[in-house]
Amino acid sequence: MKLTFLGANHEVTGSCTMLEAAGQRFLIDYGMEQGKNVYENQPLPVAPGEIDFVLITHAHIDHTGLLPLLAHNGFRGRIYATIPTVELCGIMLRDSAHIQEFEAEWKNRKGKRSGAEPVEPMYTVQDAEAACRLFRGVEYDKRIQLAPGIEARFVDVGHLLGSASIELWITEGSTTTKLVFSGDIGNLEQPIIKDTTHIQQADYVFMESTYGDRNHDPRPDYVAELVKILQRTFDRGGNVVVPSFAVGRTQEMLYFLREIKEKGLVKGHGNFPVYIDSPLATEATRIFRDTDPGCFDAQTRALLEKGIDPINVPGLRISVTSEDSRMINTDRTPKVILSASGMCEAGRIRHHLKHNLWRPECTILFVGFQAVGTLGRTLIEGVNSVKLFGEPIEVKAEICQLTGMSGHADKDGLLRWVNAFTEKPRRVFVIHGEDEVENRFVDTLTEQGFTACAPYNGAQWAIGAEGAVCLQEGTKVRVEQRTGEGANRAATVFQRLVSAGKRLLRVIEHNEGGANKDLAKFADQINALCDKWDR
């Protein structure tokens, strides 16, 4: 058999590995690159129509985001994933397609005056729907035949609802070889979902290394920490605004808030309202509720057996329309507002920041990672004011963060996972980690007696009865090395300008329905700016 490493090698996003075995070609994940692009993903070495099937570890876009493009370009095989992953991909891929269409529309508006050729979105909602029709849901822990000589089993890995490690048995001639793809290995004791299931045997292992060089801080008591924040904020008469990722983190927060409200832990404010103001989060929450209870951890199942919905917060209010969203801030009752996006770069959360950042009685609570350059990161690092919808907004609210809420295993967790094999695999391929992190984790594994390596994008390996042989080294040239430092700096600055333009378009759309006088003034300001810079 032959393996080609196409993405998320010496970087974290864009996961994809192609296998050619037992007369079949298939992919493990087909994700979109996100954030800084250190090593470019390699293109598929064959036409999409020549791919027989795809196996998906979990629903996050960096593992699934190019599936609509695959369908657009002629792939007609099956996409296998756990049943919850199929459900989550149904909403997440459509959401991603809406973003692709929006960005293409923005670029075309921008290029129309200059006579630039129109651009097409990477893929459309129609492509996403076509990809979703190719999904086939499989049960956890059930060994299935994908093709003659190829069998698979999906094992819960505790990263996200539906996440899995994938065991593969590949028989060629008289030899059967077992491969294990870890997927994203989960952190211990996450709410709602099960902890990672360890696998006992494999010949070859392909494992992630996101936190391969460091451990998480000690896990705090999230409920106790959250109670303190709610208590002091509500006592001041303010709101707690939570920028939250729609899938996973929002449901974890609902789990904590249900316990807080049911036990009456916030004194004097027992009936405080909780709002979900994100259409994607609302859909994801519905999927969590409808999922087979067997996917949940023991604590969650125990609640369900008592007739308690673990994420049904008393007083929970779902905001559907834009008007619903706007009305939230007309009510001065102290409340919790869960809204996307988690890094405050887009979505309804920006409206809530506009209405609450300037109020010293309010709190903005961050519960997830904030990337460099995002509004969320800016607020956490400390700033006196920010611009929202063209207005300078003073930052007087309390800014705080619940640390340690990670869905990924840390270094010790990764080592627990790989050391659970009863015999050391013949080789461990380290993937899905930043450049130096992968190298350090390879060193750690080597010190513990494993044979390990970290292939680059484009690397090819053959695996047979005699072992694994590298056929082709991947590309070790970093993107910034190839383009040159000066060009890279220029590209970065221009990308800032492009991002500002996208933000302007969002601001324009958010002002739909405003007073004519205000809209006219806004239009005059934009036209004056364009007249100044049009070349």
Region locations from a protein language model:
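Short, surface-exposed amphipathic charged segments that create phosphate/polyanion-binding patches used
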Residues: 150-154, 287-295, 415, 465-476
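A polyampholytic, Gly/Pro-enriched intrinsically disordered region
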Residues: 100-105, 292-305, 387, 469-495
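Charged, amphipathic alpha-helical linkers/stalks
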Residues: 458-518
